[in-house]
Amino acid sequence: MIRSFIRSSALLLALLPVTGYSAGPLILVGGGLKDDNTAIYQRLIQLAGGNGQARIGVITAASIPESDDPDAGTADAANSKANGEFYAQLLETYGAADAQWIPIDLDQISNNSNPQVVAQINSMTGFFFGGGDQSRLTQTLQTATRADSPALAAIRARHNAGAVLAGTSAGTAIMVQGPMVTGGESYDGLRYGVYTTPSGDDLSYDMQGGFGFFNYGLLDTHFSERGRQGRIVRLADHTQVPFAFGVDENTALLVQNNATLGQVEMEVIGENGVFIFDLRNKERGTGSTYALYDVLGSYLTAGDRYRPVTGQFVIASGKTSLRGRERYSAAMTVTTDIFSSPNNSGANGRRKPREFVKVSADLFDSRVTSTLGRTYETNPLSRRSVQKHAVRQPWLPGHRWRQEHAVLPAFADGFPS
């Protein structure tokens, strides 16, 4: 076990930069960003130069254009221009000296090479990418061969010079360097596999990736709320990417250089948490059904930090170790919707959002070492075993656990041996 850990740590060091993170910070929001999330918005303003100094360019090309919005020009408008103007006003409310919509969308693709728009971009100290559909971002900010347009090249140059980039939902997903998830549900990914063309609930991804600002693993959003643990692990396994990051709603993963340490450091900001999955020591099952074992998962919440070069986790002060203080003798009743299925929905959406987190948190506050979670779909039934890691210290609310995945026939009552 120790030798295996040393070997895998050496692999990690070979994959990641060993020097400081030279570009500007990244603020990766998992979607569902509330207007009153002071922690995230104020951090964006601070990193862009501070109150009265920050100049933020707002990019909402992931939204539908004005020409496709039946409510354009009304208070119900939800198009690129309306969303851009809304975010610009909100950012100025939080202290930006200036915030401007960058007028590039499906109605105005040619603006990605307009010298005036490029000059506008060059005057900014930070950028905010709104949500929607990341395919619209590739259509509007990249060329037909997926090269940078002049506008994206200018954004990249500003970022390399220190400008902060923030994104939410699709605006976060597009930041990834490697394979980019484009759709799908956890159950479907585990049951049917991975595709390169989006269709319904199929797990799909773009092999060419996103804009390449985040190079530490896969990225996913709306994570715990939509039970996306299964889909990101399946995609990471399929694409042979050793790490995957899932950001919850109204929550951000801040990625920036720690000058004192001389290396990149990630910090969780906001309401919920961020999952980090480590697949370096994964093992595939040998049976006829898909099975994956020894995936390590960590769940960090506000103030917790992760240093990817060394693999070190730093738990925020004020959080207390649960070891020896567990309140329960048994974990919660086995859930029948571990991945918060959209097929189990009511008037307010998914009936059991964040179910994976609830099950895991309950496990760590108990004196047992493992629990099971079942999927809502039963043909076939999929079970998940969540286990406490035998070595690492559990924390609340920064839980860490070992996770096993397998898709089993409905009549099975255990994992493949």
Curated annotation (Swiss-Prot):
Transmembrane segments: none annotated. Inhibited by serine protease inhibitors. Inhibited by N-Bromo-succinimide. Its EC number is 3.4.15.6. It is found in: Secreted. Residues 1-23 form the signal peptide. It catalyses: [L-4-(L-arginin-2-N-yl)aspartate](n) + H2O = [L-4-(L-arginin-2-N-yl)aspartate](n-1) + L-4-(L-arginin-2-N-yl)aspartate. Keywords: Hydrolase, Protease, Secreted, Serine protease, Signal. GO terms for biological process: proteolysis. Its main location: secreted. GO terms for cellular component: extracellular region. GO terms for molecular function: peptidyl-dipeptidase activity; serine-type peptidase activity. The keyword Signal applies. The active site is at residues 169, 188, 222. SUPFAM superfamilies: Class I glutamine amidotransferase-like. It comes from the Bacteria. Exopeptidase that catalyzes the hydrolytic cleavage of multi-L-arginyl-poly-L-aspartic acid (cyanophycin; a water-insoluble reserve polymer) into aspartate-arginine dipeptides. Belongs to the peptidase S51 family. This is Cyanophycinase. The lineage of its organism: Bacteria, Pseudomonadati, Pseudomonadota, Gammaproteobacteria, Pseudomonadales.
